């Protein structure tokens, strides 16, 4: 190797290494809510900053999640997913008796199966939500034997009514709602998306305990994913406007370290008006 080639490699190699290590996505950030097992989970999300390829998930639980997305083409949707009891990523390989059942689906809701990160059933409702708009979600759980039916409801402010989107039933061993959480995810993952900020506030969360009493969700623990392709440092969470905020990507600066237990003001004495399940 001649002297000129050696100098060229010395100059270029750090750039190549830097390019290879550049994050492809903003880091997924979560709020985990300490709560008892529940028959209903209500939560609100207000998106302040979004970009194509963003998922703002309001009502997550062991076996499913429910929220809003801005897809890669800019289309806005409401999405609700529930997992099969079977393990694996091939949706077609799951035996019929282990697949999620669709007990109810609104006419303008699309439902189908998914694979790739577990398998199960998911539904999509076209809804052009806006930044600054508070979106409201309710998930209920009804146990019958070893199965649980999870119903997803979304509030339509223009009609001032709740819309029952879908009810999925899956094998749970007879469990109700547990392991409650929210998150923000960058699913575009094209490098540029790591440089773009996503910010939302999750507020006024409530759970209905198995015996029927409603309890506010006033604490949440800050968490984040550990995928190697994500930007690790540009994450944040905290308390603002009576709720919990999550932020990731772009020029985000951390004000509270991971694992911080956040506490919001108690707020209302009871949840807002909800549909009768």
Segments predicted by a language model, with ranges:
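Short beta-strand segments enriched in hydrophobic/aromatic residues
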Residues: 45-49, 84, 141-143, 156, ...
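Activation corresponds to long, low-complexity, non-globular regions
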Residues: 22-55, 180, 184, 189-277
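Secretory/extracellular carbohydrate-interaction modules
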Residues: 21-109, 267-276
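Local beta-strand/beta-hairpin segments that build beta-sheet-rich folds
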Residues: 22, 159-168, 217-219
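Bacterial N-terminal signal peptides that target proteins for export
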Residues: 1-8
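Carbohydrate-binding surfaces in secreted/extracellular proteins
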Residues: 129-163
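Bacterial Sec-dependent signal peptides at the C-terminal "C-region" and cleavage site
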Residues: 11, 15-22
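Short, aromatic/His-centered strand-loop micro-motif at the edge of beta-sheets
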Residues: 114-134
């Amino acid at each position: 190797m001649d002297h000129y080639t050696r100098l060229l490699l010395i100059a270029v190699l750090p750039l190549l290494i830097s390019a290879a290590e550049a994050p492809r996505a903003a880091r997924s950030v979560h709020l985990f809510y300490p709560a008892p097992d529940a028959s209903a989970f209500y939560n609100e999300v207000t998106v302040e900053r979004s970009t194509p390829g963003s998922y703002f998930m309001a009502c997550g639980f062991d076996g499913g999640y429910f929220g809003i997305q801005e897809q890669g083409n800019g289309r806005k949707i409401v999405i609700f997913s529930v997992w099969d009891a079977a393990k694996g990523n091939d949706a077609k390989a799951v035996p019929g008796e282990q697949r999620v059942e669709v007990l109810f689906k609104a006419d303008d809701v699309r439902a189908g199966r998914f694979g790739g990160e577990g398998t199960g059933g998911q539904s999509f409702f076209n809804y052009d939500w806006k930044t600054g708009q508070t979106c409201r979600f309710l998930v209920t759980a009804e146990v019958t034997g070893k199965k649980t039916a999870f119903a997803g409801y979304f509030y339509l402010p223009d009609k001032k009514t709740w819309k029952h989107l879908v009810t999925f039933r899956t094998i749970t061993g007879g469990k109700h709602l547990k392991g409650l959480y929210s998150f923000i995810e960058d699913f575009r993952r094209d490098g540029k998306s790591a440089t773009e900020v996503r910010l939302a506030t999750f507020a006024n969360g409530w759970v209905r305990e198995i015996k029927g009493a409603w309890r506010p969700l006033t604490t949440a623990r800050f968490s984040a994913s550990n995928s190697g392709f994500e930007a690790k440092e540009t994450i944040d969470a905290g308390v603002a406007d009576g709720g919990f905020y999550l932020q990731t990507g772009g020029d985000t600066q951390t004000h509270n370290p991971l694992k911080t237990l956040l506490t919001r003001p108690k707020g209302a004495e009871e949840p807002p008006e909800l549909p009768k399940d």
